[in-house]
A protein has these predicted regions:
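Mid-to-C-terminal functional-domain signal that highlights helix-capping/loop sites
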Residues: 100-134
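N-terminal domain-start signal
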Residues: 1-103, 107, 111
């Protein structure tokens, strides 16, 4: 992702993504996070499916939180910074994005916060990485 502003500005605000086959595929991949056998999540596939949904449906919170987690897992601290920047830009348009129900938005934000904390604990952060978080 080149920059957060460019990323979000490329897309319109999206609606409910459930009518797209990629949405079902994305949810199936993300469900691995809670599967008892703990199969590996294919983060490259999560990123690919998220981008496909953004192109077809526009940006909405449910897909964006999956995308943010995927680029964090794939790109480390730089991905986390870009993803959270994109999330910040979307949240500034609170009145415009899906889902419209506040409780659904809060649930998605709580979920991504928990998953980002877990991801952050696994990152190997070096001194030279620190400018990415300031």
């Amino acid at each position: 992702m080149a920059s957060n502003a460019n990323f979000i500005s490329q897309f319109v605000m999206g609606g409910d993504p459930c009518t797209y086959k990629e949405s079902g595929e994305l949810q199936a991949e993300m469900s691995k996070l809670t599967h008892p056998a703990r199969p590996d999540v294919d983060w490259r596939q999560v990123e690919k499916l998220s981008l496909a949904l953004f192109r077809q449906n526009g940006v909405e919170l449910q897909t964006l939180v999956c995308y943010v987690l995927a680029i964090t897992r794939r790109q480390g601290l730089a991905g986390m910074a870009d993803g959270l920047g994109s999330l910040d830009i979307l949240l500034q348009r609170w009145a415009d994005f899906w889902p419209v129900q506040v409780h659904s938005r809060i649930s998605l934000l709580s979920w991504v916060t928990e998953k980002m904390q877990q991801a952050l604990r696994t990152l190997d952060i070096q001194y030279q990485d620190l400018p990415q978080i300031y």
